[in-house]
């Protein structure tokens, strides 16, 4: 009998073991679709980004007009740009839902998979930030100025570090060219890290909504979950194309229709919606270094989540108190996102400070506390 090429070929068997014959729990829900959706987001962003890069010029005098030229004169350039800009938003929607799923179902107990995931999140955030600067509009320029300036809060080396990052004494041409370089490079780094992320995941196999070992009841990934993934792709690409075609500027900042001007500061400097929660935490501390540390902690705190798991059950499926706390955290992040978009004045200042405090309290104190309490309740 001739050997099955799919199972014997050195390259094909790797693909087979990852996407075709992969043993998968039979009860994973739609919340497990977001991994593959993130893959589709990455592929879409790399494809549209490559086409945009072919028409883009990374120079302060030409960047803005080169983007305008792409939208006006390049065949379907407007569509490529709109898909790329809004694709970033969908990338973040998917990654936040993916992380939320991981938190709710205790997937963070696969420590290596979780940690590589956080590194992926940080790389994605860096990519989105440098990409936002490229069209060289007002908010691009001032966003870059404000955020890079935060590094100057680092004691002793701060100012040197910022000037080194800028390539001068302010955000200027060298900054733009290096940001373009980074924006081109980082997505491929994300693709590489994704493979590491998947390698770690396939060491243990997928978690499932019950949080129990599912080895006794696993099914092949194809055709069951491959079909389910295709449905997910359709449900992702439909709203993306709808947004890109009907309301492409809905999530953008009107300031970016004005070319960058170092002499005029916009009245309200704010990042894209997906960074607003972190921006609100940064602004809630009236001290530069303190704010920067809180900003870093708001994302890096995810590294501590596996250490703070005190429950005897893995998932929150049968833990109503933890569920309540989880949805409180979601509401809290929504409040932070809203506060980040508001001006720094009463009552937004105090709301932001309280929401920031609540964010860290829930993650660092209340989750382990409630987990321990639920264990005690189970014993009685």
UniProtKB/Swiss-Prot annotation:
One of its GO terms (cellular component) is mitochondrial inner membrane. It is found in: Mitochondrion inner membrane. The chain crosses the membrane at residues 34-54, 78-99, 114-134, 179-199, 227-247, 289-309, 321-341, 348-368. Its cofactor is heme b. It is a multi-pass membrane protein. A ubiquinone binds at residue 202. Binds 2 heme b groups non-covalently. SUPFAM superfamilies: a domain/subunit of cytochrome bc1 complex (Ubiquinol-cytochrome c reductase), Transmembrane di-heme cytochromes. Keywords: Electron transport, Heme, Iron, Membrane, Metal-binding, Mitochondrion, Mitochondrion inner membrane, Respiratory chain, Transmembrane, Transmembrane helix, Transport, Ubiquinone. Heme b b562 binds at residues 84, 183. One of its GO terms (molecular function) is metal ion binding. Its main location: mitochondrion. Heme b b566 binds at residues 98, 197. It comes from the Eukaryota. One of its GO terms (biological process) is mitochondrial electron transport, ubiquinol to cytochrome c. Belongs to the cytochrome b family. Heme 1 (or BL or b562) is low-potential and absorbs at about 562 nm, and heme 2 (or BH or b566) is high-potential and absorbs at about 566 nm. Component of the ubiquinol-cytochrome c reductase complex (complex III or cytochrome b-c1 complex) that is part of the mitochondrial respiratory chain. The b-c1 complex mediates electron transfer from ubiquinol to cytochrome c. Contributes to the generation of a proton gradient across the mitochondrial membrane that is then used for ATP synthesis. The cytochrome bc1 complex contains 11 subunits: 3 respiratory subunits (MT-CYB, CYC1 and UQCRFS1), 2 core proteins (UQCRC1 and UQCRC2) and 6 low-molecular weight proteins (UQCRH/QCR6, UQCRB/QCR7, UQCRQ/QCR8, UQCR10/QCR9, UQCR11/QCR10 and a cleavage product of UQCRFS1). This cytochrome bc1 complex then forms a dimer. This is Cytochrome b. The lineage of its organism: Eukaryota, Metazoa, Chordata, Craniata, Vertebrata.
């Amino acid at each position: 009998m001739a050997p099955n090429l799919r199972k014997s070929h050195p390259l094909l068997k790797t693909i087979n073991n990852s996407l075709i014959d992969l043993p998968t729990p039979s009860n994973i829900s739609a919340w497990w679709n977001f991994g593959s959706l993130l893959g589709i987001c990455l592929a879409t962003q790399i494809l549209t980004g490559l086409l945009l890069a072919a028409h883009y010029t990374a120079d302060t005098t030409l960047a803005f007009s080169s983007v305008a030229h792409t939208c006006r004169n390049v065949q379907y350039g407007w569509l490529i740009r709109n898909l790329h800009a809004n694709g970033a938003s969908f990338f973040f929607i998917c990654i936040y839902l993916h992380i939320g799923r991981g938190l709710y179902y205790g997937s963070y107990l696969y420590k290596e998979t979780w940690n590589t995931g956080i590194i992926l999140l940080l790389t994605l955030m860096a990519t989105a930030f440098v990409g936002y600067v490229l069209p060289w509009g007002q908010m691009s320029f001032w966003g870059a100025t404000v955020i890079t300036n935060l590094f100057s809060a680092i004691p002793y080396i701060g100012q040197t570090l910022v000037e080194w990052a800028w390539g001068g004494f302010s955000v200027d041409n060298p900054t733009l060219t290096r940001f373009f370089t980074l924006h081109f490079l980082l997505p491929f780094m994300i693709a590489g890290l994704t493979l590491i992320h998947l390698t770690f995941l396939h060491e243990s196999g997928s978690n499932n909504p019950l949080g129990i070992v599912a080895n006794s009841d696993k099914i092949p990934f194809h055709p069951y979950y491959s079909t389910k993934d295709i449905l997910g792709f359709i449900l992702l690409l439909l709203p993306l194309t709808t947004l890109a075609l009907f309301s492409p500027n809905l999530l953008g900042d009107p300031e970016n229709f004005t070319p960058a001007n170092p002499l005029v500061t916009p009245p309200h400097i704010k990042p894209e919606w997906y960074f607003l929660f972190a921006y609100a935490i940064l602004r809630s501390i009236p001290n530069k270094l303190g704010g920067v540390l809180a900003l870093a902690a708001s994302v890096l705190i995810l590294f501590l989540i596996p250490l703070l798991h005190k429950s005897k059950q893995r998932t929150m499926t049968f833990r109503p108190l933890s569920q309540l706390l989880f949805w409180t955290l979601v509401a809290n992040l929504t409040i932070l996102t809203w506060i980040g978009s508001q001006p720094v004045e009463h009552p937004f200042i105090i709301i932001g400070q309280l929401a920031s405090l609540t964010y860290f309290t829930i993650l660092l104190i209340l989750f382990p506390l409630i987990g321990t309490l639920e264990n005690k309740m189970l014993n009685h």
